[in-house]
UniProtKB/Swiss-Prot annotation:
Binds 1 Fe(2+) ion per subunit. The zinc ions have a structural role. The gene is Tet3. Dioxygenase that catalyzes the conversion of the modified genomic base 5-methylcytosine (5mC) into 5-hydroxymethylcytosine (5hmC) and plays a key role in epigenetic chromatin reprogramming in the zygote following fertilization. Also mediates subsequent conversion of 5hmC into 5-formylcytosine (5fC), and conversion of 5fC to 5-carboxylcytosine (5caC). Conversion of 5mC into 5hmC, 5fC and 5caC probably constitutes the first step in cytosine demethylation. Selectively binds to the promoter region of target genes and contributes to regulate the expression of numerous developmental genes. A zinc finger (CXXC-type) spans 50-90. This is Methylcytosine dioxygenase TET3. Zn(2+) 3 binds at residues 836, 838, 924, 992, 1001, 1061, 1712. Highly expressed in germinal vesicle (GV) stage and MII-stage oocytes and in early embryos. Residues 993-1006 are annotated as: Interaction with DNA. It is an enzyme of class 1 (oxidoreductase). Belongs to the TET family.
Length: 1803
């Protein structure tokens, strides 16, 4: 990018560097209206080494002016070391080459202009651009400008000259009388141009060859100093002749010096900041030009051209000659024989021979063209023309195009830009780059190569032009600055194209610009366009385009007034450019007009200079660009309009445009100039349109253009395309300057102001820019605003490169790195530090992130004033707190958020809180920045109260929690959100958000986006949520706008474009999405994907007990800035007041931050891990389901057999339980049960396969889709049969028996009843097991419960508790008892509800153990339930027996044991399984699980037989999701099947277990574990089948037991987390009961106050306590922020709901980016098609073809997939169910899921 920028930058730099006298600098290369400075030219010729410092003429107005204006860039920025632009000698403003031409006129004032321009442009551009500045100057210099400057010396280029009103017509009117001057110099100018072109070529070579300034004699420096001092004395635009004459120094020496200066050699006393000394460069250029003019005055300047120039830029004779001159350059390219110069150029420039030849041809043509003196000829030889009085006006442009195309033009242009204060070098250059860059710069390289000299370097120069062309373009843009059309010139002329400036000027000022500028502009435009086109073809050109962005510099006069030295502009070019592109208007006139806007970009040209370097390396061969044949006709046509345009000088930017446009040459919009705009915004908006037809026109006009095409057929083709696309009028418009004006607006086509003489060129130039890269193209050819719209999208890129494709969008042809820069939105909004001298270097790491969109000021008092104005209240209403950035994050030992200082609302009077940071070491305008704004009364209280209730109710039931990385510490081991997945803190996302898959909005492919999606199908709830959020967004936006207007504006910029991705009901929608965080602890993070200069707006809603000011609630959540500490003083610097705040509580200083340490037993799995596991689980589940469905009978039989397996506890768990469960499965309707269980628990879980932590499934269950800790929030379960529990758990614990199962009565759900999260507490309260059973199934006693609908069940569950509540057995036994009744009803009801109830029952079933504990209830319930629901079971011992046996172990109570024993005894392994299965399965399984949950259900479940299923349930109960899982797949099945047999089996174990409670539990857990290990093995298939029959999610015993195992392991973690999981496995039920409380106790014991943070005062931790209905605004993208963990998070009744409104940085596409997605899909489809064709060609099968296409991404995986598929096909149907799942499903789901695009259709 820098390379591309370099050319443009060079010009700007030159302007800055060569601002000897400010005025001169302004003129830059275009000292004269278009004349290159004679000295400059000479220097250029000589390579710049021999250039001598030119002297001020002492006669022009600027020279006679003794006081600085104080407003120009030179005055305001003394670093440029440039004399005030208004005092810059007119002579010095002209390039040396121009002076030579102008010397004829220069003496009349033209010379000075030309010389100044030459110097500036030449030196600036030559290093990178190629032609020496003088060459550029001579070619492109606009005599019209010179005319204008006649009074002031060099007004034409003077556009850059602050003093010369004639500059660009801004400083003064173009003088018609100057026309004679120009005319007089016309011949010489032509010669000068030719010389300049040669000089440029030579200079480019020399510049590269020259190693140091050592070659320069100190005498040169002395001369320079003398002249500079003289110039400083007289800033008037006195004639440049004096300077020129001084240029008598050895030309070689001057050229060498120039080359060295351009390479960084500065005079000993130079204090310039830039790499070059703008003044010295300008002076050298002036010298060289003056010498060139002296020696080259003989050069035929197009005489005709001069008069037209006088008449007006439009004068075709002048312009055409220039065009001819330029064009001739092109023709020589075509037929130029390979010469030594060409070879040397090729060698030195490392360019192709063709390019070198083209350059040489251009050089020759430029010199020859001046002779013809017809407009074409002149156009062809812009440099010479620039030298001539008439040429000067156009000359700047021509000169830019021809002489400095390679090197000089950019520099010369910069010189001009610097010379004229109106053209800040940077901005003007960019403008010219845009306007001229498009037209003139391209033309100049082509024309200037031949025109300045036929040296072999012309090609190199041309190439440089490509690289340098951007410089030229810059200079062209600068030139518009210098030109009367200051608008454009201002932006670009100073920096990049002084010559172009004259063109705009001429356009603005009809007299000067009319004829000569017309021709010259045409020639320049043609050349520039051509070159631009080439640049577009090559990356460098794209950069040049960026310079063109600066094409809008104002007239030199305008720029001069700004006083920003043209050379300086490079510093500001980027911004300026962006601004300038808007400035350029449709025509050259418009360009001139825009020039003033461009003015600022003058400085940036210096930066552009860097791009120049890149430009020097033309990516796009100049040869093609040089072809001007096609442009010639356009140039001629454009010429006619030019005169008119010239007659009416457009604004500077427009002037630049008009200059370029004046030249009928079609600008080469397609030329991509990759040069930063002089202003520093090297990139022009990609869509920016630049009209630089003028250069093209010039090329066309010039006969040389014809010859050039032969040099390169492609070039010729390009020219023709330009002609066709741009038409003749393309020369007229000055879009280049316009685009330059708006370089920043990348995809914007800015039409240059239309010149009065020509309609807006249809071929507007499109400027595509990003970062430092700008691409100029003709995409906008036929649309005035074609810029943005014309820019093709990525998807539109042609598969094969074509000229038309390139013209449409050069970006398509950029290399990947460049394209990445252009395509990466983040690159576009890089932070830009303010320019201040407070510190040497801004280090954000030390002073904190820098941003000002929240507000900034020099002092805290200024912030107060600012915020008082914004809020509308004063005094105490606004509270400002100072914070200090330390960079040391405050966090707990586990890496979780803590607070050290808490800022609270102290009184109701306080309305607004602002946190401000003083940037260490700064005392500038942005020394203090606002980092946080908190409006305590952000929304109406009523609205906040309503929102809190609505969101709590809705999200608790239907919310789908989002797993966020910030929810965990770095190790993923903390449980800050809470351990209960049903109540833990969670965040919910709504609105549009980013999708990496779509690379855009996640709704890109959604026909009916559900922005407020909830789980399940709940349109009404979603509508409520939508209304709530939309209303809130509408309510908050105005406040946001009032408190942070800049941030607000940044966020609504693209609202109209991407309104689909915005929230809000009224215009002004700054938000795209909202995240609802409910008791969610967000660990320290930055919202990296938020809009770059946007903010997050957080609306806080708090619990009822935290809505009063002055009261600190028991539990609260704070918003923390971990890297800041509180200042010791208040906003007024008073420590006492600060201490008073602390004592009053307004600031709470903490000495510790005690928080319970909640830790996960093992690190939580990442989203990716969970996804992979989910896929695997889903595949296995499908396989199991298929197997179950396919062989239910077989499974049943196996289940029965398993049930008959040994009753040994271990066996029962493994085999016995499995058998029992299997038998029950058989007895129970497998499908019904399966579906019931499956849908009750697993169905939901599976529906959230991608929920991640939010999954309802058991975190540790193998069967769960995701294996994650229960800590992860689980989505609200779908209502069971329409029943929605108000509890976080699924109604009846879909996934098993969640401890807080909503289905269960609140008493059971309560931590006390269930033992929070399966904690011992619930187990302790086990007595409610029966009650739980009753509540779960009111008909526990009867089978009715199972039959009840889900809602009824839930209701019953809630109510019936008392019935089975008998607390006789507080342990799991009670739960078991209730389970028994449940089992029987559940088994009865095969309906899903039954299944649901069975889940409940299952829990209860497990509770039959409780019945054991409760001898009464168990026998009664068990017998009743067993008998009623399962006669066999009851007979066998009834559920009581079964459960009793099972529960006996867990319960450990003698009663239970006895009962259980009896029951278990009654329940033979085989019988009870059989009986229980039916009812137990549906009921028992679920019941058992729930009951177990309440107790240390795990212990109960651990009971051998039942344990596996019930145990799972119990575990699940501990971890509701687990139960769900088990209930769904494992628990439920296990419950029933295992219940029977396991209970029987577990009788012995269980009885002992019952007796030894904890021991039993241990046994149970151990057996479960063992069973998990064993069972899968012994009865894996049968169990699996049985499970399947039951509809269990587990595919096999392994799965079931695996789930159990995982649960067991998980359970342990759960126990730790929930308080029961850990102990139950190894200890008994009793212990399990204890385990919950124990864990809690342990957790309570594990507290941390993060002492270490409070020992170091520099560790941050400033927190604010957001109040109810408050609105907090902060830049979350830049500031590290966090929210503290709550002591007892419960999202069912959240302590704090924070609604975070934000806008993603890239959600700026209409219709959610559907068009982009479709385009991408088309592209992928095409690729897929190609792959298929390739596969067909290679004879690959369909499968192989798929793999073939995906190999790169999937590698082995893909191969495996095909194999699987083959196996699948080969495998018999009996295996088909499983195989397809494994191979096809697994592979496809896995691999294809990862693949984007066309692959999806292969799934």
């Amino acid at each position: 990018m820098s390379q591309f920028q370099v050319p443009l930058a060079v010009q700007p730099d030159l302007s800055g560097l060569y601002d000897f006298p400010q005025g001169q600098v302004m003129v830059g290369g275009f000292q004269g209206p278009g004349l290159p400075m004679a000295g400059s030219e000479t220097q250029l010729r000589g390579g710049g080494d021999g250039r001598k410092k030119r002297k001020r003429c002492g006669t022009c107005d600027p020279c006679r002016r003794l006081e600085n204006c104080g407003s120009c860039t030179s005055c305001t920025n003394r670093r440029t070391h440039q004399i005030c632009k208004l005092r810059k000698c007119e002579v010095l403003k002209k390039k040396a080459g121009l002076l030579k031409e102008v010397e004829i006129n220069a003496r009349e004032g033209t010379g000075p202009w030309a010389q100044g321009a030459t110097v500036k442009t030449g030196s600036e551009l030559s290093p990178v651009d190629g032609p020496v500045p003088g060459q550029m100057d001579s070619g492109p210099v606009y005599h019209g400008d010179s005319r204008q400057l006649s009074t002031s010396g060099a007004p034409v280029n003077g556009a850059r000259e602050p003093a010369g009103p004639g500059l660009l017509g801004a400083a003064g009117p173009w003088r018609v009388d100057q026309k004679p001057d120009w005319e007089a110099a016309s011949g010489p100018t032509h010669a000068a141009r030719l010389e300049d072109a040669h000089d440029l070529v030579a200079f480019s070579a020399v510049a590269e060859a020259v190693s140091s300034y050592g070659a320069l004699s100190t005498r040169l420096y002395e001369t320079f100093n003398r002249e500079m001092s003289r110039e400083a004395g007289s800033n008037g635009r006195g004639p440049r002749p004096e300077s020129c004459s001084e240029g008598s120094e050895d030309l070689d020496t001057l050229q060498t010096a120039l080359a060295l200066a351009r390479h960084g050699m500065k005079p000993p006393n130079c204090t310039c900041d830039g790499p070059e000394c703008p003044d010295f460069l300008e002076w050298l250029e002036g010298k060289i030009k003056s010498m060139a003019m002296e020696g080259g005055q003989g050069r035929p300047r197009l005489p005709g051209a001069l008069p037209p120039s006088e008449a007006g830029l439009p004068a075709p004779s002048t312009r055409p000659p220039l065009l001819s001159s330029e064009v001739p350059q092109v023709p020589p390219l075509e037929g130029l024989p390979l010469s030594q110069s060409a070879l040397s150029i090729a060698k030195e420039k490392n360019i192709s021979l063709q390019t070198a030849i083209a350059i040489e041809a251009l050089t020759q043509l430029s010199s020859a063209l001046p002779q013809p003196s017809h407009s074409t000829s002149q156009a062809s030889c812009p440099l010479p023309e620039a030298l001539s009085p008439s040429a000067p006006f156009r000359s700047p442009q021509s000169y830019l195009r021809a002489p400095s195309w390679p090197v000089v033009p950019p520099e010369e242009h910069p010189s001009f830009a610097p010379d004229s204060p109106a053209f800040p070098p940077a901005t003007p250059r960019p403008e010219f780059s845009e306007a001229w860059g498009t037209d003139t710069p391209p033309a100049t390289p082509r024309n200037s190569w031949p025109v300045p000299r036929p040296s072999p370097d012309p090609m190199a120069e041309l190439e440089q032009l490509l690289g340098s062309a951007s410089d030229y373009i810059q200079s062209v843009f600068k030139r518009p600055e210098a030109l009367p059309t200051k608008p454009k010139v201002k932006v670009e002329a100073p920096s990049s194209s002084p010559a172009p400036v004259p063109s705009p000027i001429s356009q603005r000022e009809a007299p000067l610009l009319s004829s000569e500028p017309d021709t010259h502009q045409k020639a320049q435009t043609a050349l520039q366009q051509h070159l631009h086109h080439k640049r577009n073809l090559f990356l460098e050109q794209a950069q040049d385009a960026s310079f063109p962005t600066s094409t809008e510099p104002q007239a030199p006069g305008w720029w001069a007034p700004p006083g920003s030295p043209a050379p300086r502009p490079p510093d500001k070019p980027p911004k300026e450019k962006k601004k300038k592109p808007p400035t350029p208007a449709g025509g050259p006139v418009g360009a001139e007009k825009t020039t003033p806007g461009i003015k600022t970009s003058v400085r940036k040209p210096i930066q552009i200079k860097k791009s120049r370097s890149r430009d020097m390396q033309p990516l796009f061969l100049p040869v093609r660009q040089i072809v001007l044949e096609g442009l010639k006709p356009q140039a001629s046509e454009g010429q006619a309009p030019l005169p008119a345009q010239l007659s009416v000088p457009p604004p500077a930017s427009q002037g630049a445009a008009s200059q370029s446009c004046a030249t009928p040459l079609t600008p080469e919009p397609s030329l991509a100039l990759f040069a930063p705009s002089p202003s520093g915004d090297s990139l022009l908006p990609p869509t920016q349109e630049m009209r630089s037809p003028s250069p093209m026109v010039a090329l066309q006009s010039g006969s040389t253009g014809g010859p050039l095409p032969p040099a390169d057929d492609k070039l010729e083709e390009l020219i023709r395309q330009f002609e066709a696309e741009f038409g003749d009028s393309f020369g007229l418009p000055g879009p280049p300057s316009v685009p330059i004006q708006e370089p920043e607006n990348q995809s914007t086509c800015l039409p240059a102001p239309e010149s009065p003489f020509a309609t807006r060129s249809p071929k507007k130039i499109k400027i595509e820019s990003s970062g430092a890269v700008t691409v100029l193209s003709t995409t906008c050819f036929h649309s005035e605003e074609g810029g943005q719209e014309a820019t093709p999208t990525k998807a539109e890129n042609p598969l094969t490169p074509t000229l038309s494709g390139f013209l449409e969008s050069p970006l398509k042809y950029l290399d990947t790195p460049t394209k990445s820069l252009l395509d990466t939105p983040a690159k576009k909004a890089q932070s830009e530090f303010p320019t201040c001298d407070c510190v040497e270097q801004i280090v954000e790491k030390d002073e904190g992130p820098y941003y000002t969109h929240l507000g900034s000021g020099p002092t805290v008092a200024s912030i107060r004033e600012l915020m008082e104005d914004r809020y509308g209240e004063k005094g105490k209403a606004i509270r400002i707190e100072k914070v200090i950035y330390t960079g040391k994050e405050g966090k707990s030992s586990r890496g979780c958020p803590i607070a050290k200082w808490v800022i609270r609302r102290h009184t109701l009077e306080e309305k607004l809180l602002c946190l401000v940071r003083h940037r260490a070491g700064h005392h500038c305008q942005n020394a203090v920045i606002v980092i946080l704004i908190l409006a305590w009364e952000g929304i109406p209280r009523s609205l906040g109260d309503t929102l809190y209730q609505e969101l709590t109710d809705t999200l608790r039931k239907y919310g789908n929690p989002t797993s966020r990385r910030c929810g965990l510490n770095d190790d993923r081991t903390c449980a800050c959100q809470g351990k209960d997945p049903n109540t833990c803190g969670a965040s919910f996302s709504f609105g549009c958000s980013w999708s990496m898959y779509f690379n855009g909005c996640k709704y890109a492919r959604s026909k009916t986006p559900r922005k407020f999606r909830l789980t399940g199908d709940n349109p009404k709830e979603e509508e409520v949520l939508r209304n709530s959020f939309q209303d809130l967004a509408t309510e908050v936006a105005p406040l946001y706008k009032r408190l942070a207007p800049q941030a607000y504006q940044n966020q609504v910029t693209n609202e109209d474009v991407a309104i689909d991705c915005r929230l809000g009901l009224k215009e002004g929608r700054p938000f795209s999405g909202v995240t609802a965080c409910m008791d969610f602890c967000a660990h320290a993070h930055k919202d990296q994907h938020n809009l770059y200069n946007g903010c997050t707006v957080v609306c806080t809603l708090t619990k009822e007990d935290n809505r009063c000011v002055g009261q600190i609630p028991e539990d609260e959540q704070l918003h923390v800035l971990p890297l800041y500490k509180m200042a010791s003083t208040d906003e007024f610097g008073s420590e006492e007041n600060q201490n008073a705040k602390v004592s009053s509580g307004a600031i709470q200083v903490l000495t510790a931050f005690p928080r319970e340490v909640r830790r996960l037993p093992e690190p939580a799995k990442s989203c990716r891990q969970r996804q992979l596991e989910a896929r695997k689980a889903a595949a296995e589940k499908k396989k199991l389901q298929k197997e179950k469905l396919s062989t239910p009978e077989k499974i049943k039989q196996e289940a029965l057999e398993l049930a008959g397996v040994t009753t040994d506890p271990g066996l029962s768990l493994k085999g016995g339980l499995s058998q029992q469960s299997l038998k029950p499965s058989l007895k129970v309707e497998p499908q019904n049960h399966f579906s019931s269980f499956k849908y009750s628990g697993n169905a939901v879980v599976e529906s959230y396969s991608v929920l991640g932590s939010c999954r309802p499934s058991d975190p540790y269950s193998m069967s769960s889709v995701y294996s994650y800790h229960s800590r992860y929030a689980q989505p609200g379960l779908a209502s069971v049969n329409g029943f929605h529990s108000k509890y976080t758990l699924p109604s009846f614990g879909y996934y098993g028996f969640p401890s807080s199962n909503p289905v269960f009565p609140s008493q059971f759900l309560g931590p006390s009843a269930w033992g929070h999260g399966g904690s011992g507490g619930s187990f302790e309260k086990k007595p409610d097991l029966h009650a739980l059973h009753n509540s779960l199934n009111p008909a526990y006693g009867g089978a009715e419960f199972a039959e009840l609908p889900g809602q009824a069940v839930a209701t019953d569950n809630h109510h019936p508790i008392p019935h089975h509540q008998q607390p006789a057995y507080p342990g799991p036994k009670e739960y078991l008892l209730p389970k028994v009744p449940q089992l029987h009803p559940a088994s009865r009801d095969p309906s899903p509800f039954a299944q649901s109830s069975s889940c409940y029952n299952r829990s209860i079933k497990q509770e039959p153990i409780d019945p054991l504990t409760q001898a009464e209830s168990i026998p009664r319930d068990s017998a009743k339930m067993s008998r009623t629901p399962l006669p066999e079971a009851s007979q066998n011992g009834g559920p009581s027996h079964l459960w009793g046996q099972y529960s006996g172990g867990p319960s450990m109570s003698p009663k239970r044991t006895n009962s259980v024993g009896g029951n278990w005894g009654v329940f033979p392994p085989g019988e009870s399984p059989t009986i229980v299965p039916d009812k137990l399965n549906s009921f028992g399984a679920s019941c058992l699980t729930p009951s177990h949950f309440p107790e240390s259900q795990w212990g109960l479940f651990t009971g051998e037989g039942q344990q596996s299923a019930p145990h799972a349930g119990a575990r699940l109960r501990g971890k509701p999701w687990s139960p769900c899982k088990f209930g769904n797949g494992t628990s439920a099945l296990t419950g029933p099947s295992l219940t029977e047999k396991p209970w029987g089996m577990g009788t012995g174990d269980f009885n002992p277990a019952l007796k030894g409670g904890p021991g039993f539990q241990d046994k149970l857990w151990n057996p479960v574990k063992v069973e998990e290990g064993r069972i899968p093995t012994p009865g894996a298939n049968p169990l699996d089948k049985a499970w399947q029959a039951f509809g269990m999610p587990l595919s096999s015993n392994e799965k079931l037991f695996g789930a159990l195992k995982s649960e067991e392991k998980l359970w342990d973690p759960f126990s730790l987390e929930e308080g029961t999981a850990e102990e139950p496995p190894s200890k008994g039920v009793v212990k399990e009961e204890k385990s919950g409380p124990t864990v809690e106790e342990d957790e309570e014991e594990l507290w941390s106050d993060s002492e270490h943070n409070f020992l170091d005062e520099n560790i941050g931790g400033v927190a604010v306590a957001p109040a109810h209905c408050s609105i907090l605004i902060e830049c979350a993208r830049r500031e590290l922020h966090a929210t503290t963990p709550l002591k007892k998070p419960n999202r069912c009744h959240p302590t704090r709901i924070s609604l975070v409104f934000y806008q993603h940085k890239n959600l700026n596409q209409p219709n959610h980016g559907l068009a982009l997605w479709e385009a991408k899909m088309k592209q992928l489809a095409e690729r897929a098609r190609q792959r298929q064709e390739e596969a067909a060609r290679l004879g690959l099968g369909q499968q192989e073809a798929k793999l073939y296409g995906k190999k790169r991404k999937w590698g082995g995986a893909m191969v495996a997939e095909p194999q699987h598929k083959e196996k699948k096909g080969a495998i018999p149907t009996r295996q088909a169910l499983a195989m397809p799942t494994d191979s096809a499903v697994t592979v496809s789901s896995y691999a294809y899921t990862k693949v984007t695009g066309p692959y999806s259709r292969w799934i």
